[in-house]
Amino acid sequence: MEILRGSPALSAFRITKLLSRCQDAHLPVSDIYAEYVHFADVSAPLSADEHARLQRLLQYGPSLPEHPPAGRLLLVTPRPGTISPWSSKATDIAHNCGLSQILRLERGLAFSIQGPNLNEGQWKQLAALLHDRMMETVFTDLQQAEQLFSHHQPAPVQRVDILGQGRSALEQANIKLGLALAQDEIDYLLTAFTGLGRNPTDIELYMFAQANSEHCRHKIFNADWVIDGVAQPKTLFKMIKNTFEHTPDYVLSAYKDNAAVMEGSQVGRFYATAEKGIYDYHQEEAHILMKVETHNHPTAISPWPGAATGSGGEIRDEGATGRGAKPKAGLVGFSVSNLRIPGFEQPWEENFGKPDRIVTALDIMTEGPLGGAAFNNEFGRPALLGYFRTYEERVNSHNGIELRGYHKPIMLAGGLGNIRADHVQKGEITVGAKLVVLGGPSMNIGLGGGAASSMASGQSDADLDFASVQRDNPEMERRCQEVIDRCWQLGEYNPILFIHDVGAGGLSNAMPELVNDGGRGGRFELRDILNDEPGMSPLEVWCNESQERYVLAVAPAQMALFDEICRRERAPYAVIGEATEEKHLLLNDRHFGNQPIDMPLDVLLGKTPKMLRDVTRLQAKGDALQRADISLAEAVKRIMHLPAVAEKTFLITIGDRTVTGMVTRDQMVGPWQIPVADCAVTSASLDSYYGEAMSLGERAPVALLDFAASARLAVGEALTNIAATQIGELKRIKLSANWMSAAGHPGEDAGLYDAVRAVGEELCPALEITIPVGKDSMSMKTRWQEGHEQREMTSPLSLVITAFARIEDVRRTVTPQLRTDKGDNALLLIDLGAGHNALGATALTQVYRQLGDKPADVRNVQQLAGFFNAMQRLVADQHLLAYHDRSDGGLLVTLAEMAFAGHCGVTVDIQSLGNDALAALFNEELGAVIQVRAEQRADVEKLLADHGLANCVHYLGRAVAGDTFDIRSGTDVVYSEKRSTLRLWWAETSWQMQRLRDNPDCADQEHQAKQDESDPGLNVKLTFDPAEDIAAPFILKQARPKVAVLREQGVNSHVEMAAAFHRAGFDAVDVHMSDLLAGRTDLQSFQTLVACGGFSYGDVLGAGEGWAKSILFNDRVRDEFEAFFHRPTTLALGVCNGCQMMSNLRELIPGAEHWPRFVRNLSDSFEARFSLVEVASSPSLFMQDMVGSRMPIAVSHGEGQVEVRDAAHLAALEQSHLVALRFVNNHGVVTEQYPANPNGSANGITAVTSVSGRATVMMPHPERVFRTVSNSWHPEEWGEDSPWMRMFRNARKQLG
């Protein structure tokens, strides 16, 4: 084992935070220093040259002050027996740099602790504080890291002696292996294997448990029901299917695949052809697929990997739909118990305790969103939608007074994608078809995820919880998706016959499911499975849940093509078996010469015992709202701090919202970028205004009073959230229903049945809406011992509805931004509660630790449908200036958020809403506030009346310029406050979370910036006409110069980059680094090169640095790049990851010697912003006629801060006039202040060019916003092309 020291690992503020945590834990630590240390497992000693190359490879990241480690060593590494994602990717880079004798690289974090007065118990306490016990271990000596590379002999399969010991042997195995088998399933297995005349193996039992777990089989949703002694006519699943039977319109696939599919639009899908690799538009149907999953159990145990693999698994579900599909846009949601932010605890937050085996709600909301965002970011899928609810209270619900909350959290992961018409249905698995595992190797992780997540927290052994934690490698999943993309793009020649993702249960669930769904059996070889841990037993190899894997059936004649695609994308795969005529599973193990699995498929997946739920209804209790202690002014302040209501910027700016270039509505609204969007919208392609929308609906606390009302409201809210997009008819909307329940808890089962019936049998059929997809999680309870008391925290029944729809015109989407620049205006409330104004289970009751008695509900189904249809007319006719639905916090919050988005005031009169101001302002009945022009008010009110809404419409008042927020009832002032004051209250929760998680100085700067009342918002100043196509004369000549659209594994922004160059008149050619390294392509034939954004190698050796070093350490490819850069007629552009990469190639680029490096953002966080930049005077040929222009641009990076050697280096860069772009604030002043400058770069620098101007590198993404509709905000006068299109046309003009 080689040991190589790395760079300092923690910034000053991270060390300060660590010291503060030590202080809070009463640990007398005076100083901490941390640096990376690298360990290399080598097959042969490295030569001096190889050692130097490895040393250079491992020099990465920001240049932080070094000092010799002093104090006692605590070395934090991945757990022995596991392989970290860092290791997988760093080893790939080493191999691509010619260091083939390196078997594996691993990294640790070496803490040098100065704490001379710590006793041994305190050292153990400190070690626990420094690492995640689920993922890491702590050593006290560097040599102990040798354990990371320990190799073990494979363990043999174990047999369970049922022939000798009978039922007791199965019962013991059930406990030992954590199988969560029911008694009737034990009986079933005993009968089955006795009939086969042999003892089952541990792997067969484990496989059965996973395949038949509640997680995978949905037993409760398929159960028979008896309620109050009366047999019920339908299962839960049949009631959901009733929506499809009633309204099958536009649904192409439901209930039978990894995701549902509905009709989309005929558009030009943009991708490179297989023959020539040239990008072009292909006119075809882009149907819409939809899926929403939950990943609750792993997120409670270890939030980052739990949430990350939740998003990753859902992305795989989308990609594995039909014969291969394309994930496009994602959503993430969280329900947790109270945060109790230190120093910011809220009046309603009591600490009821929790078990040690799960983390706190604060931990979940600190780490979980980062994990979900990081996976989506690295994979290259924008996360555009979400929700965040906290609930934890002692309430009087159906079962009397008890604790209700989310100690077992909800982690929601979902999204939409596109699929070709001819790939919607799975193909036929032919006998002899090759059975393939695509993706990374097996590792001993995530064992038991399906069975573990099917148990209430506290029922399973803590070691089994530990075993079910997973790890994420989104860059590997991206490689696999690129393979799937290449396959579906082949159309009828697609080599994929059948595909499933690998999720719960690993291959033990995926492979039987694959062959069974294809009507076949399978014969497999265990030792052909890619395996990074050969010491695993057969059970561990077959059943582990290593992520980023798919199982496929490929025709033998197509294997050569499939192999070629995988090699080019560097996506590992293994052929592990063949499909058989007989529906039988045979798993051979050539190492031991036996068959760990040899069983008929119908034993595994056949008629296992059907569940019967015999339950009793309980009536909700609740308590009348006690108003004595409620003051309206105090209520407003509390509600503005409630996470379900409060600003969620801290959850949003960590997630890339612009990748693909097809995002037309993200969470951030208007010139002030306020996170209040009601829904997410994407364009169907890069050449179309057709699109897709998705929205969420969720009202879980209402279930504590009325199960069915809670479910109806979830559907209603999803509809009111999506209503201000141009959809057309209501039946175009399709829903995903995710049901979370504590099955078995008194009253909950019958409540679940009533809720499903309310939606599946009544509401959705009446609205003609289908639920073609969904998921259930039936173990939402946590048990623990608190002192001598046994406690339980039970989740409310929680239905999360996601609405999906095809969009007629993405430009018609209306946002909550109030407009004061459109003349006199009117604000109208459409109250679908029709005056009921119920306050039960609202934000108001929650912040006063009450529940109330009567909740909101869908009062009139016809009016709900009429409301949607009326909004469709108003959207199509462009009569709406602003729209925002009423939800958490009620009317007051709706108006406040609209005013925040418009940076304006409101004056309203609520007299028509009744005499109870508290109920009028804080009820959460369905509805919306719309803003219309004053002169159109009468017409709008008539249209609403024509749709049956006459009794729901109330004129409130108007939006006004300024900082007022005034609510009156007739002549009485009900509430008056500055809008800016409300805005700061609303922002405080996000600010406090950001301070805890990121650089607190940056969080403080952002909070301070929100207090600038003179902020004009994003604005534009152009020195050129963006409507002028300066490339047109050259395009007319029909000469299309070739641009090499360069990507490395992990790059994810190449398609939109190719589209921008294509529009400017180039032939954009897909060039993978593997093409250059293998000599299949060279740069000789290209006049332009663009290095694209993303996460090459997952940024493990510094952003873009691994990519650059794979060029620098390969002599032939290095020479090729150097020759290209020295050719006097070439152009080169590097964006984001490509910018970082090219900055590390500056020794090859003439006139680039003053270029800086790009390192970790000052905030120490990934930053996704829509930032204002100014084009500086520089030689850049890409920006030659844009100098002086100021306009917003997409920013998405974690490592964009300019790093120079010293002040002299910065001065030389400036004096050479090589700075091409700078961040400016909304006043147009160059800035280093966060967040206007999202990465902290000196002098606002965010792009530089070479002396000749032929090579330009920039951190922001012009390719994602070259279309006007792809800008989060834009002036109304812009046409199809945004001003950033000029960059690409300048390049085309330059080439003549």
From Swiss-Prot:
The keyword Lipoprotein does not apply. The keyword Magnesium applies. It is found in: Cytoplasm. Keywords: ATP-binding, Cytoplasm, Glutamine amidotransferase, Ligase, Magnesium, Metal-binding, Nucleotide-binding, Purine biosynthesis. Residues 1043-1296 form the Glutamine amidotransferase type-1 domain. Its main location: cytoplasm. Pathway: Purine metabolism; IMP biosynthesis via de novo pathway; 5-amino-1-(5-phospho-D-ribosyl)imidazole from N(2)-formyl-N(1)-(5-phospho-D-ribosyl)glycinamide: step 1/2. PROSITE patterns: GATASE_TYPE_1 (PS51273). Residues 1000-1013 have a biased composition (Basic and acidic residues). It comes from the Bacteria. ATP binds at residues 306-317, 677, 887. InterPro entries: Class_I_gatase-like, FGAR-AT_N, FGAR-AT_PurM_N-like, PurL_large, PurL_linker, PurM-like_C_dom, PurM-like_C_sf, PurM-like_N_sf. It catalyses: N(2)-formyl-N(1)-(5-phospho-beta-D-ribosyl)glycinamide + L-glutamine + ATP + H2O = 2-formamido-N(1)-(5-O-phospho-beta-D-ribosyl)acetamidine + L-glutamate + ADP + phosphate + H(+). One of its GO terms (cellular component) is cytoplasm. In the N-terminal section; belongs to the FGAMS family. Monomer. This is Phosphoribosylformylglycinamidine synthase. The gene is purL.
